[in-house]
From Swiss-Prot:
Highest taxon, organism lineage: Eukaryota
InterPro entries in UniProt: DUF5523, Tectonic-like_complex_comp
Disordered, as annotated region: 1-24
Coiled-coil parts of chain: 136-159, 194-214
Organism in which the protein naturally occurs: Macaca fascicularis
Keywords: Coiled coil
Name of the protein in question: Protein CC2D2B homolog
Any one of the GO CC terms: ciliary transition zone
Any GO BP annotation: protein localization to ciliary transition zone
Amino acid sequence: MSEEMDNVTAEEITDKHLQKDLDAEENQNVVKTMRGKVREKLKISKINKGEKSSMEQLVESKIYQRSKLSPQTEVSLDESLSFFILSGEEGSALGKSSEQRPVKDSYPKCFSLGVNLQNVAESEDEEFMKEFILTDLLKVKAADYEDDQEQIKKQKANIFVPSSSPVVNQHKLPKDMMPRILEDEGFYIQRKPEIYKKTCNKMENRLLKLEEGKCWFGESGEIMSLPTPIKQSWNFRLNVRKEPLNPLLKTIYRKL
């Protein structure tokens, strides 16, 4: 028997080790696949960046060539209107001022176009990261919502709220047993502290939910808050003598 138990334990240990190895291999495979997806998408984004950068260079070169070839042909709207509106002397003065204007004024336009294209490319890269890469790495799930009725059902299943309705004596006492009225039988009963009836009913309902809850009820069907007069409880030192007690010394309780 001991050898069989040892074999069983050894097989269980080997099975546990095999399961751990399989779980580790599955986790590694998942990590590898995720890394491969991210690398592929980064490659695609780099290729798109290269195409965008080549297009930007072509646009900038074309703008620079146009500004270099025809620097004198650039005519503003103000100059074209002044040719028809102003007189000869004023037009000649404007022409001189336009000739004195340097050709380098066209370069800021090209620079601003390049900056705008770069900003557009960066914004597109951020959108690409949000749409494709982050959706694979993160799981988006709707927020959990429960109705009020479902929450109340769960609370009722976990929390017990006792009712304030009175309990029938049959539930408090054993089967086929009637409650005893000890005062009518001549027993002395101490005065109990005043308690609201609703709180007492709640306590009785709570005790009856327990497995040994009936032990808290006496033969009268009430909660045992005071020592019962049926069972003798000695508050003094007992007489250990073998001689019998004098019957005249015994106390006899009688109801007046």
